[in-house]
């Protein structure tokens, strides 16, 4: 007999322990112990009380005759001979096994144990029949978990060694469903199943490019096997460990080949695998070097929305690299992306909209891409999406706008399209990535005087300032950077700052932050606010000098640049110059001149010029060896750097002359 009764289940278990070669150690550990060793295997094995209640309700409903007929067939499989088993399996397939009640019929009578047991037999027809049933019923999450508990994964993986294509196809189809359980994904990897599945998708390019109705029966079998393998790999790619194993098994060139297929049912799962893998840096590079970008772009114009979603999301994840962004433009990928976001029928498809807007955002980082997007009136289409209810979509939209408005023409376009009020209203959101992009975009808009007038009318400066209270450091940093042009370009900016209760206290308080980006942005904001003498007096009362002095030992060039600018702005009030010298800030600031960044040189020279107003500071600078650096800066093409360096040298020289005159006077006396 092919099937077993409950009395022989112990023998079957012992037989598996002795004969399973795919996973020799899988019986040496308790499942819970295995799960604890790998983060990919954490799975809630028990259903909630609510789930159990709904199962009971489903069973308690009027039970159809098919339920009992299916259970009779399972009994025949258990007790029948080989022929009866095959016939019963074929009859079982005639029922709709995708319905829950029919799935219950199999599991309630112990049919899952029987089906898994059949996978061990040597009769290929029985195995094929069992796999066909399993591939249908494993759409049910509880059945998937049961298959894993019955140690079915190693048996299915072993079948991938078969020489029969249809058997391997059904095994891969079953794995595609069962591996939605995390523990199953680990078992496939540890049993060596990933290289076998990768082998399934190694197919001739001629088959991929030939329409299905023109393929021979053997080629059709190969195509179906490839599709099943692609589906299984798509499910397995939810694990980082599996993705790395897939890469080592040589999946990258095979993915590139499958993307050229004319068969949508093959392209969709492999595009999904590309999308999942593109979150890994090693895959991002491989996707570019294998020339996948043009093929991904070609599918963006497909009629299939799932394919467009997978493709646009893959570009979104890969376009962090400048080379990839250029390839997208050269392949004509920007046009279909804009076509997607302006299609009103896409608005309800959030995954597709999220992928397309994200891809546009990443591509807009490159200036050449922005020029193409301008020709497509992309800013107008993005503004139309600012009323979307999905935070992820809004994050991508505002991110794309923030990159586009780096150019003055797009600031005007955004203003004319009515985008500013919509962006300002979103400042009340609690989604940190969205707030970060809003701050970046409004910072660029504040550079435009006309846009700044609108922002003032909308009370945007107060809302941006309030973002400094946000617990996310990146939001704090970009908000502080956005404050700079707002203060610089606002009407009566000095009074505007003072009208915001607690505004300067909030800024100075952030100098205690541990985040370099926040500190740098806050220093830039202080340098701007301190341009007004009244505001500078308030900052001085808030002990800003002491907090700045605590930061001078930094080695970060961005912080050095903005810190030096803040020191330059604050030094010229009261006795701040002398106090900064007393706090031993001069020598560390002189070391900033060793930086390779000319912007650091400029702000450092400006700070040193202000500090050199105090004679003691001049002496310290001279002893620190600042003169050669200043002489070199005088030859710079940057006028501000030239003037600041010359001013500092003048102050040092004047002190030296006064000292020389004093010594001569003493000698004369």
Swiss-Prot record:
Enumerate the ARM repeat regions by residue range: 100-139, 141-180, 240-279, 281-320, 322-365, 367-406, 408-447, 492-531, 574-613, 615-654
Q: Specify the domain of life of the species encoding this protein.
A: Eukaryota
Task: Answer whether the UniProt record assigns the keyword RNA-binding to this protein.
Answer: no
InterPro entries per record? ARM-like, ARM-type_fold, Armadillo
Which SUPFAM superfamilies does the record cross-reference, listed alphabetically? ARM repeat
What does this chain do? Answer: Important for spermatogenesis where it may have a role in sperm individualization.
PANTHER family recorded? ARMADILLO REPEAT-CONTAINING PROTEIN 4 ARMC4 (PTHR46241), OUTER DYNEIN ARM-DOCKING COMPLEX SUBUNIT 2 (PTHR46241:SF1)
Q: What is this protein called?
A: Armadillo repeat-containing protein gudu
Organism of provenance: Drosophila melanogaster
Phylogenetic lineage: Eukaryota, Metazoa, Ecdysozoa, Arthropoda, Hexapoda
């Amino acid at each position: 007999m092919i099937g077993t009764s409950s009395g022989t289940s112990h023998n079957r278990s012992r037989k598996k322990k002795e004969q399973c070669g795919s996973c020799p150690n899988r019986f040496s550990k308790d499942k819970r112990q295995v799960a604890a060793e790998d983060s990919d295997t954490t799975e809630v094995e028990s259903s909630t009380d609510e789930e159990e209640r709904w199962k009971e309700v489903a069973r308690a409903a009027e039970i159809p005759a098919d339920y009992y007929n299916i259970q009779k067939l399972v009994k025949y499989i258990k007790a029948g001979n080989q022929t009866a088993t095959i016939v019963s399996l074929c009859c079982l397939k005639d029922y709709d096994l995708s319905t829950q009640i029919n799935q219950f019929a199999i599991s309630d009578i112990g049919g899952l144990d029987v089906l898994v047991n059949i996978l061990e037999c040597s009769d290929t027809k029985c195995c094929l029949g069992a796999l066909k049933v399993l591939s249908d019923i494993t759409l049910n999450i509880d059945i998937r978990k049961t298959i894993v508990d019955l140690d079915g994964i190693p048996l299915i993986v072993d079948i991938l060694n078969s020489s029969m294509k249809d058997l391997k196809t059904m095994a891969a189809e079953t794995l595609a469903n069962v591996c939605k359980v995390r523990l199953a994904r680990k078992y496939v990897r540890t049993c060596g199943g990933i290289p076998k599945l990768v082998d399934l998708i190694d197919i001739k390019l001629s088959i991929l490019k030939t329409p299905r109705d023109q393929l021979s029966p053997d080629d059709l079998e190969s195509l179906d096997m490839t599709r099943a393998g692609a589906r299984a790999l798509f499910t397995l790619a939810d694990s980082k460990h599996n993705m790395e194993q897939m890469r080592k098994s040589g999946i990258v060139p095979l993915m590139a080949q499958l993307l050229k297929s004319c068969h949508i049912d093959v392209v969709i799962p492999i595009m999904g695998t590309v999308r999942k893998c593109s979150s890994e840096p090693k895959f991002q590079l491989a996707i570019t070097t294998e020339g996948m970008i043009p093929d991904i772009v070609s599918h963006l114009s497909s009629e299939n929305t799932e394919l467009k979603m997978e493709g646009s999301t893959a570009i979104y994840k890969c376009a962090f690299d400048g080379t990839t962004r250029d390839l997208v433009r050269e392949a004509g990928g920007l046009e279909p992306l804009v076509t997607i976001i302006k299609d009103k029928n896409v608005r309800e498809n959030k995954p597709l909209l999220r992928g397309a807007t994200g891809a546009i955002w990443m591509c807009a980082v490159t200036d050449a891409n922005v020029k193409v997007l301008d020709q497509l009136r992309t800013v107008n289409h993005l503004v139309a999406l600012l009323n979307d209810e999905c935070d992820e979509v809004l994050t991508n939209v505002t991110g794309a706008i923030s990159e586009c408005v780096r150019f003055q023409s797009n600031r005007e376009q955004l203003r004319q399209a009515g985008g500013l009020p919509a962006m300002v209203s979103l400042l009340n959101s609690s989604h940190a990535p969205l707030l970060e992009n809003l701050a970046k975009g409004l910072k660029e808009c504040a550079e435009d005087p006309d846009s700044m007038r609108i922002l003032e009318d909308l009370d945007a400066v107060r809302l941006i300032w309030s973002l400094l209270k946000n617990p996310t450091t990146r939001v704090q940093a970009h908000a502080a950077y956005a404050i700079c042009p707002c203060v610089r370009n606002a009407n009566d900016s000095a009074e505007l700052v003072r009208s915001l209760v607690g505004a300067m206290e909030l800024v100075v308080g952030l100098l205690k932050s541990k985040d370099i980006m926040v500190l740098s942005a806050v220093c830039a904001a202080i340098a701007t606010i301190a341009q007004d003498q009244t505001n500078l007096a308030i900052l001085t009362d808030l002990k800003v000098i002491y907090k700045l002095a605590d930061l001078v030992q930094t080695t970060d060039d961005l912080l050095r640049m903005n810190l030096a600018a803040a020191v330059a702005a604050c030094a010229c009030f009261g006795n701040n110059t002398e106090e900064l010298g007393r706090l031993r800030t001069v020598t560390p600031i002189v070391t900033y001149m060793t930086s390779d960044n000319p912007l650091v040189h400029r702000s450092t020279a400006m700070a040193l010029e202000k500090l050199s107003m105090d004679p003691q500071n001049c002496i310290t600078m001279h002893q620190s060896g600042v003169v050669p650096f200043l002489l070199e800066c005088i030859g710079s093409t940057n006028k501000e750097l030239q003037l600041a360096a010359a001013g500092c040298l003048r102050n040092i020289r004047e002190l030296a002359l006064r000292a020389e005159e004093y010594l001569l006077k003493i000698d004369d006396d």
